[in-house]
Amino acid sequence: MVRKICAVTGTRAEYGLLKPILLAIEQHPELEFSLVPCAMHLSNEFGYTIKEIQKDFKIDATVDMLLSSDTGSAMAKSIGIGTIGFSHVYEAIKPDLVLVIGDRLEPFAAAIAAVYMNIPIAHVHGGEITAAGVDEPARHAITKLDIHFASTEESAKRIIRMGEDKWRVFVVGAPGLDTILNESLQSKAKIARKYKLNLDNPLLLVVQHPVTTEVEEASFQMCETLEATVELGLQTVLIYPNADAGGRRMIKVIKKYEKYPFIKTFKSLSHIDYLSIMNQASVMMGNSSSGIIEA
């Protein structure tokens, strides 16, 4: 009997983690998946990254859930819209399992819909700690649901301490590293040519997201980072923040610094290009988890 997995992705970074899992599912004779992009993937404001997914896989459904507002209230409403959208998708697809990654509002909405429809949930990257924002409580809330694929032994132990049965917890490593290990990154020459960089000189990579419990500080925090960037004066690749509350305020600040010729800004990059630029960078600045895991 073939089991159908509904795989959910809402952001460019999350898709980079999900892709190697989907490739592994494709190779398994008793598994198949339906892929459901949502939220930032469908937004022109954040690079319309669904086009990158379409190069790799067939898309079975989408959930348009992202409100164009920069507040916690908008995030809460997006979760509600997403929960409704995913319930419709599950009714149509009838999955045996829902696969989600991490701690954002998109997997949270997908998990809420699944648990009330009695669909098992497989959660990757549970049991981890985030210093600030709503990410950690959201992650731990998802962690209370069904099957857990932890990236480290420490995360697995944390999940078990939260009361989850040991048989539900598996240590599988960080799937984002599979791409680094199994796929070829772009060459130094190709990255330099494509993004008009001089990689004989130091390169700074900046990726900073809003802290959702410090929304009012988002503009100031981005300004502080960019003032430091200007002070360094290195050629810089700067990628837009995510769509959480405060993200649009940060983008307004970023646009003021685009006047500096050594700062190149991008709404989004393909996962391979992002890893390739990271591989060439001398310094990475910001608060992206990729600066801890992939870097």
Question: Where are the model-predicted features located?
Answer:
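A nucleotide-sugar donor-handling region in carbohydrate enzymes
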Residues: 42-47, 144-220
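Active-site and donor-binding regions of nucleotide-sugar-utilizing enzymes
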Residues: 4-9, 16-26, 65-166
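A generic structural motif
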Residues: 28-34, 233-235
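Structural beta-sheet core signal
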Residues: 7, 35-37, 100, 123, ...
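Donor-nucleotide binding loops and adjacent catalytic segments primarily
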Residues: 53, 186-280
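Conserved nucleotide-sugar phosphate-binding/catalytic loop shared by glycosyltransferases and other
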Residues: 32-75, 85
